[in-house]
Amino acid sequence: MIEIKNLGKVFTEKSGKVVALRNASATINDGDIFGVIGMSGAGKSTLLRCLCLLEKPSEGQILLNGRDLAALSGADLRSARRQMGVVFQGYNLLMQKTVAENVAFPLKLDKYDKAAVDARVKELLELVGLADRAGSYPSQLSGGQKQRVALARALASNPQVLLCDEPTSALDPLTTKSVLELLKDINQKLGVTIIIITHELAVVRSICNRMVVIDNGRFVEQGETAEIFENPQSEVARLLLGKEEV
């Protein structure tokens, strides 16, 4: 279980302080596919960077199974990061490395032996449907295939949580459908909790069982996806869903 408690993030810039997250609280249950949706600049990407500890929250807590991740440092922080796989927007693949080498990269950083690395890479490429592209380079892949490599790499260390930043934003409708089906498969087969940051309503509706709407750094509405789509309570949710009052 992930508990976000009163999370805040303030950036200091030359022009002054920018509040990116404000008193954000939510509970994400084990096995959820949890959607975070909002307009551009709402705070979605900052939330993801705080969740995976690339940004230190200014205040509040991020609890993973009761452990406050925001309070960790050093070896404890590195260990906690292994529990969260991240798929960044734009894939972030190593262009001079093969598909297999990209997936193996985090395992080699953790000093797994070659046999263990090879076995895990083989397993993951089979899972994402790219067993026949192990020796290919990213430049030889389609957008959907690159996303599958990014997913396999994010799963390399057996994380409890998979964070996906706009995982379908650059994909055509058919490829989007196949990637979402893969995410469902990963969730069901591996029991991984998935958090999807997106601006695409169709993505949330088709795959997320629970969701939160974020606006100006605040969580303005959250709950069961079907209920929010059927009867949005906040002005922002109604606007996003095309149900604003006339």
Predicted segment positions?
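ABC family nucleotide-binding domain
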Residues: I2, G8-N216, V220-E221, T225
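C-terminal boundary and immediately downstream tail of ABC-type ATPase nucleotide-binding domains
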Residues: A226-V246
